[in-house]
């Protein structure tokens, strides 16, 4: 009898395929501030969070609240962070994007006002404020896509700290193994044609080839539904 495919096990949701969220430190969000006011806080620590690639800053605000915020480049222990409509537009501060001059870099941008921040949160990335209109602001995302947002959406001024991560090689499989343990992914990933026949429909044989058509029906049963699912065409486009 064959075994379940990886896609079937992933759908079942066993611990191997679940993110170890119990080890994550905090759900990053911007502090809530009343309109036309500002809130100040001091950075008391810079920490690593297994949930993300960028460092996080622990900030003690003047209202007694302590929050973890996404650290931008230049933020250090002892710095003062301002948040709100009256906050100065400088790296590390949290301000509405409608107050940010054109050409400035921003990160951890809200999708809707007061949702806490949804976009541009990976290490070393940034978005650019392009232009302002009375009811919306255009922001150039890291992908190059222009996104129009409510000018009351808040963002952190500056570039996310931890840049250059993608330029550094893994060097050892063990380092990547430990990194992947913090994600909802199975590592290493084995090629289907390298498996045994009991593990995958493309497994087995004297050499590495699928042994059957790689196109498969949309209505195929779960144990067979692998390869090019309901493909309109295969190969290079001519």
Curated annotation (Swiss-Prot):
One of the primary rRNA binding proteins. Required for association of the 30S and 50S subunits to form the 70S ribosome, for tRNA binding and peptide bond formation. It has been suggested to have peptidyltransferase activity; this is somewhat controversial. Makes several contacts with the 16S rRNA in the 70S ribosome. Residues 1-22, 202-223 are annotated as: Disordered. Residues 1-11 have a biased composition (Polar residues). GO terms for biological process: cytoplasmic translation. This is Large ribosomal subunit protein uL2. Belongs to the universal ribosomal protein uL2 family. GO terms for cellular component: cytosolic large ribosomal subunit. One of its GO terms (molecular function) is structural constituent of ribosome. It comes from the Archaea. Pfam families: Ribosomal_L2 (PF00181), Ribosomal_L2_C (PF03947). Part of the 50S ribosomal subunit. Forms a bridge to the 30S subunit in the 70S ribosome. Keywords: Ribonucleoprotein, Ribosomal protein, RNA-binding, rRNA-binding.
């Amino acid at each position: 009898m064959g075994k379940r495919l990886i896609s079937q096990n992933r759908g079942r949701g066993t611990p191997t395929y679940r993110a170890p969220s119990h080890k994550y430190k905090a759900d990053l969000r911007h502090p809530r501030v009343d309109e036309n006011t500002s809130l100040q806080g001091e950075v008391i620590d810079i920490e690593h969070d297994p949930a993300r690639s960028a460092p996080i800053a622990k900030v003690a605000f003047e209202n007694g609240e302590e929050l973890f915020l996404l650290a931008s480049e230049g933020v250090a222990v002892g710095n003062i962070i301002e948040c709100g409509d009256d906050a100065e537009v400088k790296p590390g501060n949290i301000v509405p994007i409608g107050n940010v001059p054109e050409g400035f870099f921003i990160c951890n941008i809200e999708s809707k006002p007061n949702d806490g921040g949804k976009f541009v949160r990976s290490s070393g990335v940034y978005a650019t404020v392009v232009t302002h209109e009375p009811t919306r602001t255009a922001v150039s995302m890291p992908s190059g896509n222009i996104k129009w947002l409510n000018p009351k959406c808040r963002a952190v001024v500056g570039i996310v700290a931890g840049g250059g991560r993608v330029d550094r090689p893994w060097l050892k499989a063990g380092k990547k193994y430990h990194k992947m343990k913090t994600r909802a992914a199975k590592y290493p990933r084995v090629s289907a044609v390298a498996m045994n026949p009991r593990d995958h429909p493309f497994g087995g044989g004297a050499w590495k080839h699928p042994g059957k058509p790689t196109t498969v029906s949309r209505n195929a049963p779960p144990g067979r539904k692998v390869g090019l699912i309901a493909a309109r065409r295969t190969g290079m486009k001519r």
